[in-house]
Amino acid sequence: MKSVTLIILLLNSALGFSQAAEFNFLSKTTVKWDKTPEGEQLQHYFVFENSGDAPLQIQEAKVACTCTKVSFPKKPIPPNEKDSILVSFDTNNKFYWQDRTVELIANTKRKGKLKLKVYVIPKDEME
């Protein structure tokens, strides 16, 4: 019984000292554009810092639509270093309010989430 208790205590201590990377976005994670003409290509840079104590490695950026493209650093981001993620949205064939979410898969405890909101004015409604 003593050996089982010792093993549990050692495992708990090891987990408590584990290193982790963490996203710390330095600006809002939701960007909103009002009254954008259909056909515009929108872009926004999301600046972040790795506030963890291990290098941050982004493996994937999940999007629900091919109209949204994401460019992220492929190299690990050291602790306390800054970098950015570029999100582009193509408004062609998109109308009225559009909401897009980017889910960032990385070696962090929580997934990063970025949001784009845009009101697209259809070509046939523009003056």
Which role does the model predict for each range below?
Residues 4-14:
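Sec-dependent N-terminal signal peptides
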Residues 19-45, 120-127:
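Beta-sheet-dominated interaction scaffolds and their linkers
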Residues 38-45, 92-101:
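Short, solvent-exposed loop/turn segments enriched in Ser/Thr/Gly
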Residues 48-52:
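Asparagine-centered strand-capping/turn motif at beta-strand->loop junctions
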Residues 53-84:
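Surface-exposed binding patches on compact interaction domains or structured appendages
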Residues 85-93:
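Short, hydrophobic beta-strand segments
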Residues 95-124:
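Terminal connector regions
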